[in-house]
Amino acid sequence: MIPKSFRSAGPLATARRILFAGMSLLCVVPAFSQKVHDAIRPLPAGAVRLDGFFENDIRNSIDHWNKGVVPYAAMVDFFRNGRSQFALGEMWGKAVRSGCMFYRYTADPELKEILSQTVKDLLSTVRPNGSISCVPPEKQPDGPGGDLWERKYVLLGLDRYYDLVEADPAVLRAMTDQADCIIEQVGEPPKVPITSLGWSPNHIESSTLLEPFMRLYNRTGEKRYLDFARYIVSTGGSEGYDIFRQAYDNVPPHEMGGPYPKAYEMMSMFEGAVEYYRVTGDEYVRRSFMNLYDNIRRNEITIVGNGGGDQPYHPAVMGEGWDHTAVEQTNPDITRMMETCVGVTWMKFCSQILRLTGDPSAVDEIEKYIYNGLLGAMKPSGDGFSYVNLFNGEKVTNYGWGTTFGSLPVTCCNLNGPMGLAYIPFVAVMESDRGPVV
């Protein structure tokens, strides 16, 4: 772990010394009925410039991953022709989401063209009921296949494109059609309950739709999207376990959700909970996500800023579940731990807490992961990230969920790692009512 004194001299310190003449020119996204305002806000696109190894790693990833080997067309074909295994439809949204965040930083015209072409390709796959899905309407919603999880990432990818690259009305229409189709299919009986849909034992992954529905509500002001978000919260977020209540009651993360305390999906759902709180001011939800943040920070995060493991509590979750990892991190029986998806989502969840509250502990957690876990998981060639990250095991591994495109292995972590890099300039320098925040 890099000492604090060394870290303060790195690329983030360079960003701290930058003055931004255009800080007041913030891009404003409509926020209807907003009850809670953030203590800290991001700067406009292009306002931050890094140097040193952060800049090198970001450019390396853009050149060799987002503009390099990512098989965008093949990922779109999952929506056109179907998928061979569950959840493969997540890949397109993840690849596009990180590309859009990189574009926010670089304004790279070549990257913009790549993103524009693949978005156009995706929109050509819209099904007659308005969905962009890997399965035909008569098989929707496909629970075991991860249909809602896939459609969530379609929404997030399109949302980032619309917000950061091009505000194309066709993209907004695709998002509203996608969301409206979900509302028609999922909900209280006679619709299909959201907590009955998914591949996992408790189906928590489907409730991560909370975030894109809140984003779409903030963009459109359409009450039906807020109503659907409220429905998700009312279900507790998983089958058989009220994750919001467990977080509110300070249940340890590795005991939440029964046999499946899946770290990545749990934090992804609570990212949506923060967005929900901003609009509703629901203090029950706020206490839930603040308790979860504090309990993860104290009980799950290792010396390199990531968490989760397979031993001793949840070997069936393959190292991707909470494991009381802060204590168990040196357990010699661990064979899989610290999934890159977990670390990047922890970083994003921390950025939500930072913006909402201004709590400096969130910065400490973000820095710890960036300097250690994130950069340590990146392939030197820039074309991917390690799946799991043992302290004393293989440096880079692709063993886990994913598929192969020709000779290229693509995993969820290959796709999430670049998002972590793209968040570095996003969080490095922001602003508050009192001025720059570094």
Model segments located where?
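Bacterial N-terminal signal peptides
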Residues: 17-28
